[in-house]
Amino acid sequence: IKQPTEKKGLQMKRIRRAYSKTVSLIDETAVQIYQSFVGKKKGFLLESYDKNNGRYVFMGKNPEEVIKSKENGLVIEKEDGTTKELSGNPVDLLKGYYSDFEIRKDDEQLAFTGGLVGGLGYDFVRYKEELPDNNPDEIGISTISLMLVTEFLSIDHFAETMTAVVVEDDTEAGRKKAMFRCEEMVKEAFANIRKDEKSEFQPDGKIIKQSDTLEEYSEKVNKIKQYIIDGHVFQTVLSQRWTIETKQKGFDLYKELREINPSPYMYYFNFEEFEIIGSSPEMIVKQQGKREYTCLLYTSDAAD
């Protein structure tokens, strides 16, 4: 059976569909399900750990592709281990590579139907604007680190349900394959639930490197104060980079973070060679259909 396509200019548009299966939850948590379903594999967790302000949790493993920036280009790693390198502006390459990719859905309740998840580093802005780039690369992590997700689990806090979603060919054969995989995913999610597990977290962090001394940091604070007085800025987030040595596992650190600083926007990405852990009180931008939402702090036309 041929993959369904539609003509789009001179390109052939690849059409896929999101198939799903929903089951009820009793008292299973997102962390318990993640540990059972994803475990130590390459994967992600986007969690709302504030049920009053967030509804959904998404998690997945074994991405179809991993996309990373490399100098002036992209490296695309397939699930089978093969790689493809593209040269040019990474933002333009991303748009071009996935412009012919469309996911359709039958269930309008699906808040997420698959696609790219991951992180964009601060230097991502340099792909869109001409800015000085004199800072050394201290950590060696790609500015763009994304996963193409075509199978994942979604937890709905309000409905107290879990949905397995698989993106497959928009054909009868694709539907059968996807629904079989959905059944497997539900079993995997509950197979190794550990409800009485105790936290193994033991604070052992040792700071071995700081980006600023107290004097250097204080000098930057005073400089920002002057910028505000002069009217150049009205707010600045001043950060520091600390390198901390620890024996803790990445996901254990994430679990500790969600207890210390729970929020509607928590995230954990395991790219195997590195992990990203974070918690935010608010979103920056969201597009749903033809509507675009921004928080007041970041409201700007610059994204255009």
Where are these regions (language model features)?
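N-terminal amphipathic/basic-hydrophobic helices that include classical n-h-c signal peptides
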Residues: 1-11
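Extended alpha-helical targeting/anchoring segments
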Residues: 12-300
